[in-house]
Amino acid sequence: MELVYEGKAKRVYKHGDFYIMEFKDEVTAGDGAVKAQAPGKGALTAELSALLFKYLSRVVETHFVEYKPPNALAVIPAEVIPVEVIVRFKAYGSQLRRMPRLRELQHLSRPLVEFHYKDDALHDPLVYPQEVVEAGLAAPQEVEAIEEMAVRAASALRDLYARAGCDFIDVKFEFGRRGGRLILVDEVSGDTFRLLCRGEHLDKEYFRKTKDVNGLIERYRDLLQITKETFTRI
């Protein structure tokens, strides 16, 4: 297989008509400023992403094809749009620094959608939807469609984890183009969303705050188990 891309958390290989997305046993924080080996993390995030992509396929089109145990997904190649789309249901993280009058975990009256330009050196700056259009990254109708798809997918995840009594705070998505259509790409895991279960983070926020790799792996195992158990009740 030909390596076509390597990022902080994944390697992507070309394999026939598909790409193989291999998840690393590494965890990073602060746009890669903090990095640690995390044995078993790749398999946990790959399996969880596979489950959640299957679940989300009922509400949005995705690049997911199949799970390749233990730590990879087969996906459809797509032209990735260099914008991260964050959907927030509760105030948290960088939003509190921008608007300190919000309380941590304050419920937002409706989902708040943010666009961030993907650039680690610039720390993925917040940008306006019009700037995405003016920069030629997406057409106006694509920006509208991306926002609608992101809210639909995020709401589906919130509803899924609500069944387990968990509090879905926010999620980061990426989108791409395939045959003139917009599709959800990248991954959906504890690396890309924040989830509180019984008041405890089962996501990468735990590592950001503690730098405890073993504790993160325990929480990712719990997250995968909760997700599987919740699926049996759908």
Swiss-Prot record:
E.C. number(s) listed in UniProt: 6.3.2.6
Pathway where it operates: Purine metabolism; IMP biosynthesis via de novo pathway; 5-amino-1-(5-phospho-D-ribosyl)imidazole-4-carboxamide from 5-amino-1-(5-phospho-D-ribosyl)imidazole-4-carboxylate: step 1/2
Domain of life: Archaea
Keywords: ATP-binding, Ligase, Nucleotide-binding, Purine biosynthesis
Pfam hit, one: SAICAR_synt
Gene Ontology biological process: 'de novo' IMP biosynthetic process; cobalamin biosynthetic process
Reactions it catalyzes: 5-amino-1-(5-phospho-D-ribosyl)imidazole-4-carboxylate + L-aspartate + ATP = (2S)-2-[5-amino-1-(5-phospho-beta-D-ribosyl)imidazole-4-carboxamido]succinate + ADP + phosphate + 2 H(+)
Molecular function per GO: ATP binding; phosphoribosylaminoimidazolesuccinocarboxamide synthase activity
Class of enzymatic activity (EC top level): ligase
Family: Belongs to the SAICAR synthetase family.
The protein, known as: Phosphoribosylaminoimidazole-succinocarboxamide synthase
Provenance organism: Pyrobaculum aerophilum (strain ATCC 51768 / DSM 7523 / JCM 9630 / CIP 104966 / NBRC 100827 / IM2)
Gene name of this polypeptide: purC
